[in-house]
Amino acid sequence: MTEQGADLKRGYYLLNTDGGNSGDPLGRAAIGALLRTRRLVTVAQISKAIGPATHNVAEYQALIEGLKLARGREIQHIRVYMDSELVVDQVNGVSAVRQAHLSELHDVASNLVAQFVSFRISWVPREMNAEADGLVNDALRARD
């Protein structure tokens, strides 16, 4: 590993995630995730359709895939930003997970979170998550 690579792994990374669907309760859904250094250099991104899913399932799937992307690069410190207040509040323990299908996804996300040395997740307004939202829209358009 280069000295620069080692330095990056010691620092924290930024992960913006988003999930969405075509508007029906179980419409075509897609996820987007953007992994960057703290200097906003893009390291990796995800833009893919995930099949029929609710908006909240897509949001959780985006978080899970983004965390897997970071762990696959041996990243230890991460700051996550997403525009789903529900997912952010549930991951932070502010709100209970009341739906069984979300509970399973919450458990997967929690297990991934535990693998980081430091983790923080914060809600951001949609306009501050535009790049991740764009990745979702790209994936949805690709399937049209």
State each model region's role.
Residues 3-57, 68-76:
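RNase H-like nuclease fold core
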Residues 33-36, 52-54, 98-100, 139-143:
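Short, low-complexity, polar/charged sequence segments that are solvent-exposed and flexible
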Residues 59, 63:
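Short, conserved alpha-helix that lines the donor NDP-sugar binding/gating region
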Residues 20-26, 64-136, 142:
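RNase H catalytic domain
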